[in-house]
C-alpha cells in the first residue's frame, strides 16, 4: 500500500504519471483514506468521492502557484495526501497533527483556510482580483459541492464574478446526481462543441460580422433566443450562463481523462468558467456508497463491516435533543423544527420522519433559517432552530434584527457548544455566550445534564420571547430522565452544594466538574459551595450575591471564551452592585482560537479539568493564608 503515493509530493509528480498509473494511485489513496479514517474518524464519504477530481486538478493546475480553494474543506484529504503530507496523514485530526480542513499555516498548497460552507467562490474571486491588480498570471480554482451551492454567499459571489468577467474557474462537485438525467448524447455533444477552440473563435467572428451589417443586431438577438431555447431544453447549466459563466459539463467525475480534458479547456478559457462534475459520494467503499450520509462525518469504525466503534452506551446530548423534540411535538401542536442542512447532525431525523409537514431543512442557509423562524413565529407557531454553535454565528444580524428586536418566540437549540474536538478551530462553539448575551430580550440557558436539557427546551417553548439552549458535543451524564416536563423559573440558579469558604459558580458542561472539585476540596478542609447557574441571561442575581458576600471567593467555570462570557457577566453583576471586596477567578477559554484534538485533551490544555480547578483553589487559599511565603516561591519559579 502506498507504492505510488509514497513518491508523490506535488502537482509535478502527478503530471509525470500515466493515466494507468493515476488510476492505480486513486486505488491506493482510497485504501489509505479508509484505513486512516477508520481509526481517527473524519469525513470519509466526501473524500472517497473526489479522488479522481483531485488528481485531475493537480494534473492540470500547478499548485501552489495556481490556487485551489476547497469549499468547506472537509473533502481536502486527497489534496493533502498528494501535497507532501502522506507520511503525517496518520495524525489526521489529532492534536498537533494534520488538520481535517485546509490550513495555510500547514502547507503552501492550502491556498485559503476553510471549514464553513459556501465561502470558496468569494475567496477565489478576491484572489483573482488581487492577481489581476498585481499583473500576475496564474489560475484560481474554487471547488464547491452541490450542497454548499445552497448557501446565499455562493450565489452572491457567482453574480459578482459574472459581472466582473475576470478569469476564474469554479468546479461544481455534484455528488447528489440531481442533474444526472441531463447526461446524454445531446448534452455530451454540446459540451464537446463548446470546448472546441474553433467553436469559440468562430462564434466571436460571426458575432463581429453580424454587428457590422444593418439587420445584423436583430439576427444576433434572434439567434440568441433560439440558442437559449435549445440550451434550456438540454443543458443543465443555463443558470450559470445567465450569471455570466461559461458552463462546461456535466462530466464524469471518476473518469480521469474526461476530467483532465475539461479542466484543460477551462484553464484555456477567458472569463469565469464553471465546470460541472458528477461524482459518487463514498466511491470505492461499499458501506459508504450505500449510506453516504452516515459516512459523511463518522467516528472510528470497523473497516470490514463499516459499523461504528461505540465508545459509550450513554446517549449524546444530540440524541436526547432529538428524542425530546419528538415528545415536545405532542405537547405543542404549533411547534416546528428548522435546520440548515444538518438533519442527522442535529438529531432531527426521527422528528422529520414523524412530522414531515412540521420539519424544514433549508439547506446551507443559516440566515434564511432564522428569519424563516421569525416569520413562522409571527404566524402563531413556535419554531425551534436546531443549529451548531459555530454556524449560528452566520445569522447574527437575523437573530438580533428579525427575532430579538421583535421579541418573537423562537427557540435556538445550539448544538456542538464548547470544545467539539477533532474538527478544530472552525467548528468549536466557543463564542455563543458572548455574541448572544448583549442582545436584548434573549434568554440563554445551558443544562448541566440531559435531564435538564429536556426541561430547558420545554421552558424555552413556554417562554413568550426568544430563548437559546446550548449543549455540548458529548455523551450525557447517564442521569435518570424525568417522565414529564417542567418549567424552570426564568433566571433561577440551582444550589447543588452549600458552602461557606469558596463559591464554584458553573454553567452547562462545567457543573459536573465543579461538583467533583468541591468533593476533593472538602478533603482538603475547604468548604465549597457549588451553584448550577443554568442561565447566563438573566443571571440569578439574588443567589450569586448571597454566596459572593458569604464566601468572598468566586470561581466561575464555563466552556466559552472568557471575553464577554459567563464569567464576565458575573463580574459585571458584582461590580454594578458595588461588591468590590469579592475576588472573582474565571475559568474558560482565553483570547485564542482552539486547535483540533481530542476533547478531553483540549479541556485539560485550557485548564478545564477537576484537578486544575482544585489546584487553583488550593493555591488561592494558600496565598490568602501565607501571602509572603507564596510570593517568594513564585519568584523562584
Curated annotation (Swiss-Prot):
What cofactor does its activity depend on?
Mg(2+); thiamine diphosphate
Pfam families linked? DXP_synthase_N (PF13292), Transket_pyr (PF02779), Transketolase_C (PF02780)
Annotated S-S bridges? none
Q: Which UniProt keywords apply?
A: Isoprene biosynthesis, Magnesium, Metal-binding, Thiamine biosynthesis, Thiamine pyrophosphate, Transferase
The biological processes this protein is annotated with in GO are: 1-deoxy-D-xylulose 5-phosphate biosynthetic process; isopentenyl diphosphate biosynthetic process, methylerythritol 4-phosphate pathway; terpenoid biosynthetic process; thiamine biosynthetic process
Q: What is its EC number?
A: 2.2.1.7
Q: What does the entry list as the binding residues for thiamine diphosphate? A: 74, 115-117, 147-148, 175, 285, 366
Name the Gene3D superfamilies on file.
3.40.50.920, 3.40.50.970
Top-level taxon = Bacteria
Q: Pathway of this protein?
A: Metabolic intermediate biosynthesis; 1-deoxy-D-xylulose 5-phosphate biosynthesis; 1-deoxy-D-xylulose 5-phosphate from D-glyceraldehyde 3-phosphate and pyruvate: step 1/1
Q: How is the cofactor bound?
A: Binds 1 Mg(2+) ion per subunit.
Quick check: keyword Membrane in the entry? Answer: no
| Residues that hold Mg(2+) according to the record | 146, 175
Recorded GO cellular component terms are: cytosol
The catalytic activity, as recorded, is: D-glyceraldehyde 3-phosphate + pyruvate + H(+) = 1-deoxy-D-xylulose 5-phosphate + CO2
The entry sums up its family as follows: Belongs to the transketolase family. DXPS subfamily.
Subunit structure as annotated in this protein's UniProt entry: Homodimer.
Q: What does this protein do?
A: Catalyzes the acyloin condensation reaction between C atoms 2 and 3 of pyruvate and glyceraldehyde 3-phosphate to yield 1-deoxy-D-xylulose-5-phosphate (DXP).
HAMAP family, per the entry: DXP_synth (MF_00315)
| Protein name in UniProt | 1-deoxy-D-xylulose-5-phosphate synthase
Q: What is the lineage of its organism?
A: Bacteria, Bacillati, Bacillota, Clostridia, Eubacteriales
- The gene it comes from is dxs
Amino acid at each position: 500500500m502506498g507504492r505510488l503515493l509514497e513518491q508523490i509530493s506535488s502537482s509535478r509528480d502527478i503530471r509525470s504519471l500515466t493515466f494507468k498509473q493515476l488510476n492505480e494511485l486513486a486505488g491506493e489513496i482510497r485504501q489509505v483514506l479508509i484505513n486512516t479514517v477508520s481509526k481517527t474518524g473524519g469525513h470519509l464519504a466526501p473524500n472517497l468521492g473526489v479522488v479522481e477530481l483531485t488528481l485531475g486538478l493537480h494534473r492540470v493546475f500547478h499548485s501552489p502557484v495556481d490556487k485551489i480553494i476547497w469549499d468547506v474543506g472537509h473533502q481536502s484529504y486527497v489534496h493533502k495526501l498528494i501535497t507532501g503530507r502522506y507520511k503525517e496523514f496518520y495524525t489526521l485530526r489529532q492534536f498537533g497533527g494534520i488538520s481535517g480542513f485546509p490550513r495555510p499555516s500547514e502547507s503552501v498548497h492550502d491556498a485559503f483556510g476553510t471549514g464553513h460552507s459556501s465561502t470558496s467562490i468569494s475567496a477565489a474571486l478576491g484572489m483573482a482580483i488581487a492577481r489581476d491588480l498585481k499583473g500576475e498570471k496564474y489560475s484560481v480554482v474554487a471547488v464547491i459541492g452541490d450542497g454548499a451551492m445552497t448557501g446565499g454567499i455562493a450565489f452572491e459571489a457567482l453574480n459578482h464574478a459574472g459581472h466582473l468577467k475576470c478569469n476564474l474557474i469554479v468546479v461544481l462537485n455534484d455528488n447528489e446526481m440531481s442533474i444526472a438525467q441531463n447526461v446524454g448524447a445531446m448534452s455530451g455533444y454540446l459540451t464537446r462543441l463548446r470546448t472546441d477552440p474553433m467553436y469559440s473563435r468562430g462564434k466571436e467572428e460571426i458575432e463581429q460580422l453580424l454587428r457590422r451589417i444593418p439587420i445584423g443586431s436583430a439576427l444576433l438577438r434572434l439567434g440568441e433566443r433560439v440558442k437559449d431555447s435549445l440550451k434550456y431544453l438540454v443543458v443543465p447549466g443555463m443558470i450559470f450562463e445567465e450569471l455570466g459563466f461559461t458552463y462546461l459539463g456535466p462530466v464524469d467525475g471518476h473518469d480521469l481523462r474526461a476530467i483532465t480534458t475539461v479542466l484543460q479547456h477551462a484553464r484555456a478559457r477567458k472569463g469565469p468558467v464553471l465546470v460541472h462534475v458528477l461524482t459518487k459520494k463514498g466511491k470505492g467503499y461499499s458501506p459508504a456508497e450505500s449510506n453516504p450520509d452516515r459516512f459523511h462525518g463518522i467516528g472510528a469504525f470497523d473497516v470490514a463491516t463499516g459499523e461504528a466503534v461505540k465508545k459509550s452506551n450513554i446517549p449524546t446530548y444530540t440524541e436526547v435533543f432529538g428524542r425530546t423534540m419528538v415528545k415536545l411535538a405532542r405537547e405543542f401542536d404549533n411547534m416546528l423544527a428548522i435546520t440548515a442542512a444538518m438533519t442527522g447532525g442535529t438529531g432531527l431525523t426521527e422528528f422529520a420522519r414523524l412530522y414531515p409537514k412540521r420539519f424544514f431543512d433549508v439547506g446551507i442557509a443559516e440566515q434564511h433559517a432564522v428569519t424563516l423562524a421569525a416569520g413562522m413565529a409571527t404566524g402563531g407557531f413556535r419554531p425551534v432552530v436546531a443549529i451548531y454553535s459555530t454556524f449560528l454565528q452566520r445569522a447574527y444580524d437575523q437573530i438580533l434584527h428579525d427575532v430579538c428586536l421583535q421579541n418573537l418566540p423562537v427557540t435556538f437549540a445550539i448544538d456542538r457548544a464548547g470544545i467539539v474536538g477533532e474538527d478544530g478551530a472552525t467548528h468549536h462553539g466557543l463564542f455563543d455566550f458572548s455574541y448572544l448575551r448583549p442582545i436584548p430580550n434573549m434568554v440563554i440557558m445551558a443544562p448541566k445534564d440531559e435531564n435538564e436539557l429536556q426541561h430547558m427546551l420545554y421552558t424555552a417553548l413556554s417562554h413568550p420571547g426568544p430563548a437559546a439552549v446550548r449543549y455540548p458535543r458529548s455523551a450525557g451524564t447517564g442521569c435518570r430522565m424525568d417522565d414529564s416536563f417542567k418549567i424552570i423559573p426564568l433566571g433561577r440558579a440551582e444550589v447543588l452544594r452549600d458552602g461557606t469558604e469558596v463559591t464554584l459558580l458553573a454553567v452547562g458542561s462545567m457543573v459536573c466538574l465543579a461538583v467533583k472539585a468541591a468533593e476533593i476540596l472538602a478533603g482538603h478542609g475547604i468548604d465549597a459551595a457549588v451553584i448550577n447557574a443554568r442561565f447566563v441571561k438573566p443571571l440569578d442575581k439574588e443567589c450569586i450575591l448571597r454566596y459572593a458576600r458569604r464566601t468572598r471567593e468566586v470561581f466561575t467555570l464555563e466552556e466559552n471564551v472568557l471575553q464577554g462570557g459567563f464569567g464576565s457577566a458575573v463580574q459585571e453583576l458584582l461590580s454594578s452592585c458595588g461588591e468590590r471586596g469579592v475576588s472573582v477567578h474565571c475559568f474558560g477559554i482565553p483570547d485564542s482560537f482552539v486547535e483540533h484534538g481530542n476533547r478531553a485533551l483540549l479541556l485539560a490544555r485550557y485548564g478545564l479539568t477537576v484537578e486544575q480547578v482544585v489546584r487553583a483553589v488550593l493555591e488561592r487559599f494558600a496565598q490568602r493564608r501565607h501571602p509572603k511565603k507564596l510570593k517568594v516561591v513564585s519568584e523562584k519559579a
